[in-house]
Curated annotation (Swiss-Prot):
Complex and partners: The complex is composed of one ATP-binding protein (MglA), two transmembrane proteins (MglC) and a solute-binding protein (MglB).
Membrane topology: Peripheral membrane protein
Protein name according to UniProt: Galactose/methyl galactoside import ATP-binding protein MglA
Organism of derivation: Escherichia coli (strain UTI89 / UPEC)
This protein's UniProt keywords: ATP-binding, Cell inner membrane, Cell membrane, Membrane, Nucleotide-binding, Repeat, Sugar transport, Translocase, Transport
Record gene name: mglA
Location of the protein in the cell: Cell inner membrane
A Pfam family: ABC_tran
GO molecular function: ATP binding; ATP hydrolysis activity
Cited function: Part of the ABC transporter complex MglABC involved in galactose/methyl galactoside import. Responsible for energy coupling to the transport system.
Length: 506
């Protein structure tokens, strides 16, 4: 509902003032403000659990606020659904895209509001209007193409174009670059800036600090459900924003590299995957206590390396030698028995059972070892080991019966790492271990990884964040199109050198 009363000064497109929201026993929002100007890109920042999602759900009417006012284009609003918000000019591009993969691009653009000619859908008009919007936003996608054939970045372009078709004045973007290549990110930024030029106010949510400084004009920081500050980006530093988010100064983004790697524990020679296109002739050593990074552009086949080592992919050639003895991991069980562990890239889809508790999620990789002599599960040992995961990984939770899906991304990741440590691995492989995790939790994950290396674990980390690889690893193996293009020492290499190597075999 849009009220005709309470005009604003006209300086802001959206004004959320003094927003309060409580749930039983929890004050989720405490006097929170968010004010977005036209022709601006406004970062909304805070750790997971800071209140960002709750605030936006109050805006879209998914939650009803307890008190406070929301003005949009000078009029007080009180929406009761996301559909109502969209029809009135407020749109959101979610991290989990909301498109029908089996339908065409233009069907998705106009779903529920098809242009008609008599009793039938006017396909020609739908095509023309879709094409006109795409041309205006410089989007090169065939309106008739099935959405299921497109890349993630192209799907995001469609979501943005759909918002544009509703004449949205406020567009909220939630972690829009989490699965994009650098080239796709740059194209996305071009489109976002075009929306800004046309008078839109963009609310941009991201944990990637570099993007915030590259793209945004202002930032609002929330912490523990409270509004901390709204300031122009031009007057801030990365350290200042981090301090506002976590409530303390983080003197360093990465732990000190105090550990000295020991003898070689893993030798990989000419590793080639059976399924093609994939990795070819990959060779490297991993030392005891070493953190080895794997870098490369999207499509470089970084993940294929750890999946082949873990027995998910079958190798067609090459050798894997552990402590001087050649081994073959034909499946994940063999890999686990040989001391390998893999924390996968997609935490939500392949890492956790979101609706089950921390106890189940902590023990699932090792559940057979909890059977007693008569074949029953030893509940006492299971509870003890779950508590070990919670304590040693410093998981913030009310208890082991808590549903893991209710935890922050950082705490979910700690449970997954703890789960694998219960298998007592020698080689721990982590694929994008801090994706979607806030800055404070990232540092905690880095500390855990550094501590594991100090205890002699051999660690392999795949990451798309170059500062992360340079900050926590000892060496970086650079992949390009399935081939190793170089192995560099992080003490002496540069980001530009890694990018040069990553482009070598394209």
């Amino acid at each position: 509902m849009v009220s005709s009363t309470t005009p604003s000064s006209g300086e802001y497109l959206l004004e959320m003032s003094g927003i309060n929201k409580s749930f039983p026993g929890v004050k989720a929002l405490d006097n929170v403000n968010l004010k977005v100007r036209p022709h601006s890109i406004h970062a909304l920042m805070g750790e997971n659990g800071a209140g960002k999602s709750t605030l936006l759900k109050c805006l879209f009417g998914i939650y009803q606020k307890d008190s406070g006012t929301i003005l949009f284009q000078g009029k007080e609003i009180d929406f009761h659904s996301a559909k109502e918000a969209l029809e009135n000019g407020i749109s959101m591009v979610h991290q989990e895209l909301n498109l029908v993969l089996q339908r065409s691009v233009m069907d998705n653009m106009w779903l529920g509001r098809y242009p008609t000619k008599g009793m039938f859908v006017d396909q020609d008009k739908m095509y023309r209007e879709t094409k006109a919007i795409f041309d205006e936003l410089d989007i090169d996608i065939d309106p008739r193409a099935p959405v299921g054939t497109l890349s993630v970045s192209q799907m995001q372009m469609i979501e943005i174009a759909k918002a544009f078709s509703y004449n949205a004045k406020i567009v909220i973007m939630d972690e829009p670059t989490s699965s994009l290549t650098e080239k796709e990110v740059n194209h996305l930024f071009t489109i976002i800036r075009k929306l800004k030029e046309r008078g839109c106010g963009i609310v941009y949510i991201s944990h990637k600090m570099e993007e915030i400084f590259q793209l945004c004009d202002e930032v609002t920081v929330l912490r523990d459900g409270q509004w901390i500050a709204t300031e122009p980006l031009a007057g801030l530093t990365m350290d200042k924003i981090i301090a506002m988010m976590v409530g303390r100064s983080l003197n360093q983004r990465f732990p000190d590299k105090e550990n000295k790697p020991g003898e070689v524990i893993l030798e990989v020679r000419n590793l080639t995957s059976l399924r093609q296109p994939s990795i070819r002739d990959v060779s490297f050593d991993l030392h005891k206590g070493e953190i080895l990074g794997i870098a490369g552009l999207v499509g470089a086949k970084r993940t294929d390396i750890v999946e082949t080592l873990f027995g998910i992919r079958e190798k067609s050639a090459g050798t894997i030698t552990l402590h001087g003895k050649k081994i073959n991991n034909h499946n994940a069980n063999e890999a686990i028995n040989h001391g390998f562990a893999l924390v996968t890239e997609e935490r939500r889809s392949t890492g956790i059972y979101a609706y089950l508790d921390i106890g189940f999620n902590s023990l699932i990789s090792n559940i057979r070892n909890y059977k007693n002599k008569v074949g029953l599960l030893d509940n006492s040992r299971m509870k003890s080991d779950t508590q070990w995961v919670i304590d040693s990984m410093r998981v913030k939770t009310p208890g082991h019966r808590t549903q893991i899906g209710s935890l922050s991304g950082g705490n979910q990741q700690k449970v997954i790492i703890g789960r694998w440590l219960l298998t007592q691995p020698e080689i721990l492989m982590l694929d994008e271990p801090t994706r979607g995790i806030d800055v404070g939790a990232k540092f905690e994950i880095y500390q855990l990884i550094a501590e594991l290396a100090k205890k002699g674990k051999g660690i392999i980390i795949i990451s798309s964040e170059m500062p992360e690889l340079l900050g926590i690893t000892d060496r970086i193996l650079v992949m390009s199109n399935g081939l190793v293009s170089g192995i560099v020492d992080t003490k002496t290499t540069t980001q530009s050198e890694i990018l040069r190597l990553a482009s070598l075999h394209l």
